[in-house]
């Protein structure tokens, strides 16, 4: 039989391929129609608690927080199954509960999440359990140099995309749970949850996030980078600092070398860089106002 160095799979828009290895060493390629496969578990009201974690506070609909017993890192449940089906994964079909939203038309069309194995695995997990966990705080560095999601520590900044992605993947990697740098689909699902639960309005998401994050023009603004969880007003559904303090790396991209930062930061006004804002920079750029979060994938 002739051997090929590579092969190409082609499909209509809305079809994605998931590649895995079978039990006998064979290669399995599954075609997934993400445009119509929109069935989510209704069990989002009972968030799963992975081994090694405990429930810390909150309910499923206002910020169910789990804490890792080993280091106190905390994550918040996002009940995707409770959201409206107005998101997209392919940029064309707005029929997903889990996906990006077009909050700001001027930015949306240029940026996308690559439909790779990691995102497709997360999609299947979200449908299975009805949601996902995101870090309650921006990721910081412990005294041992390990990533953590805890209160009262300076966010991990001056980090470029590749390192943020690598660091995020080391937070959890076992048979039950894996971690990764947040995708745009996950980021926007959090924003949609804020709107759905009526703790924030669309205008506060897309136009002006001044008063619920650390911005230059926030009332009594420190006008500098501050520790995670510094103010209660900057907490929404038990997630801290989502609107400001640092903007956050995501796995959104435009082209092969440019990645997308989400949200506002302490040097910018909240009406210029609201939480839904997107800014594209080179993946090896870094700054003292750029941080990141991590998301958990439950197998």
Predicted regions and their residues:
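Short aromatic-cysteine micro-motif
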Residues: 60, 71-72, 91, 96-241
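Active-site-proximal beta-strands of protease catalytic cores
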Residues: 243-252
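Disulfide-stabilized, aromatic/cysteine-rich ligand-recognition loop
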Residues: 158-172, 177-182, 233, 254-299
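Acidic glycine-/aspartate-rich tracts in secreted/extracellular proteins
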Residues: 81-83, 138-141, 251-256, 298-299
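GGW-centered surface loops in extracellular recognition modules
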Residues: 23-88, 179
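Short, solvent-exposed loop/turn elements at domain surfaces
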Residues: 84-93, 141-146, 257, 269-272
């Amino acid at each position: 039989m002739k051997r090929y160095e590579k092969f190409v799979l082609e499909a209509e828009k809305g079809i994605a391929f998931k590649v895995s290895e079978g039990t006998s060493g064979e290669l399995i390629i599954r075609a997934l129609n993400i445009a119509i496969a929109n069935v989510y578990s209704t069990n989002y009201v009972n968030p799963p608690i992975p081994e090694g974690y405990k429930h810390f506070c909150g309910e499923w609909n206002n910020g169910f927080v789990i804490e890792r017993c080993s280091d106190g890192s905390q994550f918040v449940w996002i009940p995707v199954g409770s959201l409206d089906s107005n998101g997209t994964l392919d940029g064309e079909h707005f029929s997903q509960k889990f996906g990006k939203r077009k909050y700001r038309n001027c930015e949306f069309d240029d940026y996308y999440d690559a439909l790779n194995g990691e995102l497709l695995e997360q999609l299947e997990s979200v449908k299975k359990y009805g949601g996902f966990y995101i870090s309650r705080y921006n990721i910081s560095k412990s005294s041992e140099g390990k990533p953590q999601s805890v209160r009262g520590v300076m966010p991990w900044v001056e980090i470029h995309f590749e390192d943020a992605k690598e660091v995020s993947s080391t937070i959890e990697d076992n048979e039950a749970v894996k971690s990764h740098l947040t995708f745009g689909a996950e980021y926007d699902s959090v924003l949609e949850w804020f709107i759905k639960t009526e703790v924030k309005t669309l205008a506060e998401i897309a136009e002006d996030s001044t008063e619920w994050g650390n911005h230059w023009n926030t009332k009594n603004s420190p006008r500098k980078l501050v520790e995670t969880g510094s103010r209660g007003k900057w907490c929404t559904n038990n997630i801290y600092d989502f609107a400001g303090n640092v903007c956050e790396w995501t796995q959104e991209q435009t082209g092969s070398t440019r990645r997308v930062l989400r949200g506002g930061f302490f040097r910018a006004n909240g009406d210029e860089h609201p939480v839904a804002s997107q800014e594209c920079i080179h993946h090896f750029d870094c700054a003292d106002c750029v941080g990141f979060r991590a998301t958990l994938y439950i197998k």
